[in-house]
From Swiss-Prot:
SUPFAM superfamilies according to UniProt: Phosphoglycerate mutase-like (SSF53254)
Organism expressing this protein natively: Listeria monocytogenes serovar 1/2a (strain ATCC BAA-679 / EGD-e)
Matches recorded under Gene3D superfamilies: Phosphoglycerate mutase-like
Keyword Isomerase: yes
Protein name: 2,3-bisphosphoglycerate-dependent phosphoglycerate mutase
Pathway: Carbohydrate degradation; glycolysis; pyruvate from D-glyceraldehyde 3-phosphate: step 3/5
GO molecular function terms attached to this record: phosphoglycerate mutase activity
Keyword set, alphabetical order: Gluconeogenesis, Glycolysis, Isomerase
Residues with site note (Transition state stabilizer): H181
This protein's record includes keyword Isomerase: yes
């Protein structure tokens, strides 16, 4: 069984080196090219899908659309869930990463970005950036909407969705592609591979490059590779 993971193509805020999180930004032109290239590589590799999953953020949705279009699979059913959203960067969202490092120190910012269990500064309740002000989250319990997340909290929302919704599809023999985000995919990869809390700090997933897992009957990876050429 194969599972394909794709981090969205470069976004406008990736290009500007800004913390993005749940803020909804579009793909950059380079990101569009990355997504289209991913779709072409998937087609060349002969990978076919029966069902697709993505977040409710534009950059991931558009990446999936380009991938399916370029691989001639636009008809594949797509399921969108906030549980596949990027990690919520709290009050860091919208800030420049370099300027934030100069203000708080590179070590502190690295902990906010990469540590498994260090929370970023949280959004204030009345901050206009609160996701509860966004119509796409209106049906969610307000207690489920974060004001900031570390990777541990991100994993705690991603893995139940994997276990309850995505994994059963794979066990039924359906071929799955997931287009999501750097940290929601890092959370899933940590779970699939059993990566330690310390080792996950060093894991980087490139934008727009399909990551193919070959899974056994227990959905444990037996092989993985990137479609990067």
């Amino acid at each position: 069984m194969k599972l394909v993971l794709i981090r969205h193509g470069q976004s406008e805020w990736n290009k500007l080196n800004l913390f993005t999180g749940w803020h909804d930004v579009d793909l950059s032109q380079e990101g569009v090219v990355e997504a289209m290239t991913a779709g072409k590589r998937i087609k060349e590799a002969g990978l076919e899908f029966d069902v697709a999953f993505t977040s409710v953020l534009t950059r991931a949705i558009k990446t999936l659309n380009y991938v399916l279009e370029e691989s001639d699979q636009m008809w594949v059913p797509v399921h969108k869930s906030w549980r596949l959203n990027e990690r919520h960067y709290g009050a860091l969202q919208g800030l420049n990463k370099q300027e934030t490092a100069e203000k708080y120190g590179a070590d502190q910012v690295q902990k906010w970005r990469r540590s498994y269990d260090t929370l970023p500064p949280l959004l204030e309740e009345n901050d206009e950036r609160q996701a509860k002000n966004d119509r796409r989250y209106q049906l969610l319990d307000t207690h489920a909407i974060p004001s900031g997340e570390n990777l541990k909290v991100t994993l705690e929302r991603v893995i139940p969705y994997w276990m309850d919704t995505i994994a059963p599809e794979i066990k039924e023999g359906r071929r799955v592609v997931i287009a999501a985000h750097g940290n929601s995919l890092r959370a899933l990869v940590k779970f699939l591979e059993g990566i330690s809390d310390d080792e996950i700090m060093d894991l980087e997933i490139p934008t727009g490059v399909p990551l193919v897992y070959e899974l056994n009957a227990d959905l444990k990876p037996v092989n993985k590779y990137y479609l990067d050429k």
